[in-house]
Every structure is written in C-alpha cells, then in structure tokens.
Regions:
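Serine-dependent carboxylesterase/thioesterase catalytic core
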Residues: 48, 77-82, 90-221, 230, ...
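Generic recognition of short, well-ordered alpha-helical segments
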Residues: 55-59, 87, 91, 127
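Short, surface-exposed "cap/lid" segments of acyl-processing enzymes
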Residues: 2-83, 102-105, 132-141
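Extended, polar/charged low-complexity intrinsically disordered and coiled-coil segments in eukaryotic
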Residues: 2-39, 145-148, 152-153, 183-367
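Short helix/loop capping segments that flank catalytic or ligand/cofactor-binding pockets
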Residues: 55, 176, 255-257
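Intrinsically disordered, low-complexity regulatory regions enriched in Ser/Pro/Gly/Thr
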Residues: 35-40, 53-58, 66-71, 94, ...
Length: 367
C-alpha cells in the first residue's frame, strides 16, 4: 500500500508521522496527532556520520515516532552536513551542542534527552554532551528560608535528564591500528601509510580518527575525551546517562572495525552464533559490561593482542562506565558488504534488512 502523504501549513504528514525542516536545515520528526505531540517530553537527538545528512536517519526517526508517538520528539541533526563533517570532531561537537540548546529552547516542554548516533556521529555526540553537561551541585535557593537545607540540583545535559546514549558502528577507539579500518586488510604498512595521509582526504576529522592530532601540545582529542578535560565534562556526561549502548558489526563493515565500535580489546571479542531470534535475526550477541574500576584491577598487558598503549588507555577510560554491547551480523545478507549503512538503515529501499536493529534500539529504549 502506498504511503499516505499530506502537507499542512507547518509540516509534511506521512502515515501519521509529522516532519519539518528547521531553519538550520535539520529535520524534526514527531507524531501527526496533536495530543500525542503535545505530551512528548523526551528529546531524541539523532546524529549522522561523516559526509552524511539528516536524511540518513529518516527511517529510524520515523520508527521512533510511530512506535512512541506520545513519548518522543525526534531531532535529526544537520548542523554538520556533508563536507562540514571534515572540520574535526571538536568543531562538529560544538556545533551539535549549540544546535541541541536551540531545540531545547524552542520546545519548553522537554524533560529528558537521549542520543542515537551513527559512525563518527557517535564521537561528535560524545564531545557535545561534554559541553552540554551541567554538574550535580547543591546550592542555596532564594526561595528557601535562612538556615534551611540547600536545594539539590541534579546533573543534566542541557538542563534535561539524560536517559539513553546509543552509538551505531562508531569508532570509539579511533581508526588506527590493527584491523580498525577493515578495508586496509590489517596490513601494518597500509595502516601506517593511511595514518600519514588520511588528513589529505578527511582533513582534521581524519587526524582525530587516526590519533595524529597535536593541538598545541595537547594529547590526541580521543584521549582527552576519556576523562573530564578542562571545562569539558566528557566522562561525567557519559556517566550521567542511565544507559550507554554500542551496536557493532562483527564483520563486513569495511569502514569501522568490530573492536573499535564495541570498545573491546582483541582478546575480549566474543564468539558468536547465528541468531535464533526471529524478531532480531541480525543480533548475534549481547553483553552487559559493568563499570571497570581502574584502581582495583591489574593493568592490562598491551601488545600481544594488537592493542597498543594509546588504544589501551581509550579502552580503559571508556570502561569506567557500564556499557550494553550489542553485536550485529549481516554475513548472510546480499548487502553484507554495505553493513556500515545497513545497520543504520541509511536508505530503507536499499538497507531494509537492518530494520530489526532499529527495532531492537526502540524496544530497549528507556523512556
């Protein structure tokens, strides 16, 4: 059956889902039912990857609103469209943070916030929440009587309660090193050369991904992002979310490797079998990892499993918070070589086999 589409004064409505383009070029998606839309208090920010656009999350956004019409208001970011994604993770993160604050200002009824990000967009979102984080504090309220208890202020992201932080095929450990970028075939010479020349193609973002950036003598940005650094509360922000989830392709993703997207060492990659779940046929492994206490655990020896010292610092730093790790396989799909796009359902007509991954994200979403 063909989709029913109509255009109102402020938006296009298709099968009960309303969407409109904002001044910044981003796309907002919400329920076409006014009563549902008015009660939605949970902002879901969807962030695309390198050289992408807001339309990359069109299917995912529409599914969120179709299934949770009275709960979520979805904003598909496009402040970092196309070639702007080459400006660096930090520059993109600042733009995204400003964009999110604008959305919050325009929607005063919002109370909660979540992020769903694909590929490099996951790093951009991690940077943005570091900027948007407001620490937990106790402060005197002008409305309280003298000598009364201090008012407690919870930590927040842009003034909203942080709920879900979800990344899909994101290179959390960067792109350098053994098999982190699969199309380099794990050949050390290829990987070394790529690190030297990647900035010619992917500019500043390439330097960040290959950990070759040197901003005035500072450590590489991805290393800075595994701790609170200056006025940027990277790890405090990440830890403030009730859930942190990584979805990773176990194979056939020739852009982002399994290890870097799942925040694991080589020795920690699990053995997996074909899924027996008819609802989620491409989800092959699920793992809930508790926060890792660095002070109470022995340091991991590097080198034997392809993990270098800097990568080990990233794994250890990010493991200081708990993670849900969801492993995905499209090895039987006719489009398995496009796994990096299929896992996101970047284009429904081409990548619809990944729809069960989107369904899994929504079914486990904390409202």
């Amino acid at each position: 059956m063909a989709a029913e589409t109509r255009v109102t004064e402020n938006c296009a409505v298709e099968n009960g889902v309303c969407s409109s383009e904002s001044v910044s070029g981003a796309e907002d998606v919400w329920s076409g039912n006014l009563s549902d839309a008015s009660s939605a208090d949970h902002l879901v920010v969807m962030v695309h990857g390198i050289l992408g656009s807001s339309s990359d999350w069109k299917f995912g956004a529409e599914q969120f609103v179709r299934i949770l019409p009275d709960k979520v208001f979805v904003h598909c970011s496009e402040r970092n469209m196309a070639k702007l994604t080459l400006d660096g993770v930090d520059v993109m993160g600042e733009r995204l943070a400003a964009e999110v604050l604008e959305v919050i200002k325009q929607k005063p009824g919002l109370r909660k916030i979540s992020f769903v990000a694909h590929s490099v967009g996951g790093l951009v979102a991690r940077y943005a929440i570091g900027r948007l984080f407001r620490p937990h504090r106790r402060e005197k309220s002008e409305d309280l009587l003298p000598n009364s208890c201090e008012e407690e202020s919870k930590s927040s992201i842009g003034g909203l309660e942080p709920m879900n932080f979800i990344t899909v095929a994101t290179p959390h450990l960067g792109s350098r090193g053994n098999k982190q970028v699969p199309f380099l075939f794990g050949v050390p010479v290829f990987e070394k050369v790529a690190g030297l020349f990647v900035h010619w193609i992917f500019k500043k973002t390439g330097r960040h991904l290959f950990l070759t950036d040197d901003d005035g003598g500072k450590p590489p940005l991805l290393k800075r992002m595994v701790e609170d650094y200056g006025e940027l509360y990277f790890m405090s922000a990440l830890g403030s979310f009730k859930r942190r989830v990584v979805y990773s392709n176990v194979g056939y993703d020739h852009i982002v490797g399994w290890r870097t997207s799942s925040i694991r060492r080589n020795s920690e990659l699990p053995k997996w079998d074909d899924s027996l779940n008819e609802k989620y046929p491409h989800i092959v492994y699920e793992e809930h990892c508790k926060a890792y206490d660095v002070e109470q655990n022995e340091p991991t020896v590097t080198g034997d499993d392809g993990t270098d010292e800097l990568e080990e610092e990233l794994v250890t730093g990010l493991s200081r918070v708990s993670w849900e790790k969801i492993d995905v396989s499209f090895h039987s799909s006719r489009l398995r070589f496009a796994a990096h796009s299929v896992i996101q359902v970047k284009d429904y007509y081409m990548h619809s086999e990944g729809a069960d991954v989107i369904q899994h994200i929504i079914d486990h979403f904390l409202i």
